[in-house]
């Protein structure tokens, strides 16, 4: 990832609408899934970036401890400081963790990264999770939506729901829930991609307060729909809750 993009993320992820929406949706789905999981052990934020999610995980993990893993040493240090939690520097392709030690695993916009081998990362996640443990994956949707932010964070792939379900099933995971999100704003996203330049500025930035509030409200509506079991049929992102089989 470009260093400047890490710095942007660190600066705005506590207040930007997209990050707040992702954290709220992840916490909602994770809390519900963990409540029905037999697996104990800490919850790992694998590829935790600069720590925005790790900071907010506490209420969602049902008394479990939380830890982070981040490949970039600077981001790992920023995450540890921001979240006040242990953060190891390492790769999701080969995690420095014992087998069966985790009760939960978060992978938020990680399998899309050019430095990550999805099959290898999922094999490692399966190894480190206990039987029945919960994994939550968030991924950018649709290859044709690659953006300036994708390029700056070295994302090289985006996914469809079918691709993710097949990938997870092939590596020992049972999908419990899946939904696209960022659906109501999808027409704006599509328009932005169609008219934007390849060298456009990053999507990660502060937005005018009124616009941030409007976008946040759209995500809150989607979150309420997902909470009652409605799977959204398309969107800019895809979130999947799975359990480790075996």
Task: Go through each PLM region and give its residues.
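A short glycine-rich, Lys/Arg-flanked "PGG" loop and its adjoining helix->strand segment in the class I
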Residues: 119-134
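Feature marks short, surface-exposed loop/turn motifs that line or immediately flank catalytic pockets
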Residues: 75, 143-145, 184
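Conserved N-terminal segment of class I S-adenosyl-L-methionine
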Residues: 1-98, 104-108, 120-122, 235-238
């Amino acid at each position: 990832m470009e260093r400047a993009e890490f710095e942007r993320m660190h600066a705005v992820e506590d207040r930007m609408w997209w990050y707040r929406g992702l954290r709220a949706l992840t916490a909602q789905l994770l809390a519900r899934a963990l409540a029905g999981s037999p697996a104990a052990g800490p919850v790992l934020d694998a590829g935790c970036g600069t720590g925005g999610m790790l900071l907010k995980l506490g209420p969602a993990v049902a008394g479990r401890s939380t830890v982070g893993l981040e490949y970039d040493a600077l981001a790992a240090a920023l995450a540890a400081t921001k979240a006040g939690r242990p953060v190891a520097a390492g790769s999701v392709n080969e995690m420095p963790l014992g087998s069966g030690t985790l009760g939960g695993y978060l992978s938020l916009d990680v399998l899309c990264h050019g430095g990550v081998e999805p099959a290898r990362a999922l094999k490692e996640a399966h190894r480190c999770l206990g039987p029945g443990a919960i994994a939550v994956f968030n991924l950018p949707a649709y290859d044709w939506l690659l953006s300036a932010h994708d390029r700056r964070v070295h994302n090289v792939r985006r996914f469809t729901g079918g691709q993710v379900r097949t990938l997870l099933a092939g590596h020992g995971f049972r999908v419990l829930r899946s939904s696209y999100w960022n659906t109501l704003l999808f027409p704006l996203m599509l328009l932005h991609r169609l008219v934007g330049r390849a060298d456009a500025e990053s999507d990660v930035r502060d937005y005018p307060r009124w616009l941030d509030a409007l976008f946040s409200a759209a995500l809150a509506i989607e979150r309420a729909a997902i909470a009652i079991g409605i799977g959204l049929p398309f969107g800019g992102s895809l979130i999947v809750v799975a359990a480790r089989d075996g």
